[in-house]
């Protein structure tokens, strides 16, 4: 999965997919009452990026629905996965359940069209704080209460705080999550990737590939350089988040990687661990 980073303005959906992304990451900021409000990152953000592009969250969802609904004039067949980077650090821990509830209601109405031929992309809810695990509970229970528990099959999870993998496992246990787990690892592109290294990403890959692991997919962020792309592919990650999808696509075309990797399509289940 080539994951376009910080796609917060509607026009950027086309821009990133046209550069080669089959997945996008979108920031979601919340108001004081835990309502998802804007697709907005804010300052600071990655180097060489404008941090302040934004839309109202529901307007973005409607545009995203069009981009992922077959037959729509804005449809992109290859856009198959969306990561919502949920900026819940602005909330109190006790608001996490409400944030999940309100997020589910917004997605149900504006993205899934109340279950009536809505957008088809798989969705990853990426949460920065392990203590906000109740966001998952709130999301799940709301879809059930609204009569659409089946839509949870399109939803996976990520804790994005670079926490100890054992602690991440405990948070999922509390949330009752037993699958559909993506694990992120990484650092802003402003800091040279070798300073962080790929040790934790490799630890996540080892968990993914073990018989008793809880992780299904691993992605590494934010990668804009060819050398780092190669290192991430050599570590056998499933996804690379990038500001420059064309760079990742170029490296995937190199002879060393062409035979081993391909770009995921809608038929590739993002919740299944890939067996070599």
Swiss-Prot record:
State whether keyword Nucleotidyltransferase applies. no
Family annotation (Gene3D superfamilies): Phosphatidylinositol (PI) phosphodiesterase (3.20.20.190)
Known tissue expression: Expressed by the venom gland.
**Main localization, broad class:** secreted
Q: How is the cofactor bound?
A: Binds 1 Mg(2+) ion per subunit.
Q: Which GO terms describe its molecular function?
A: lyase activity; metal ion binding; phosphoric diester hydrolase activity; toxin activity
Localization recorded for this chain is: Secreted
Name of the molecule in the record: Dermonecrotic toxin LsaSicTox-alphaIB2iii
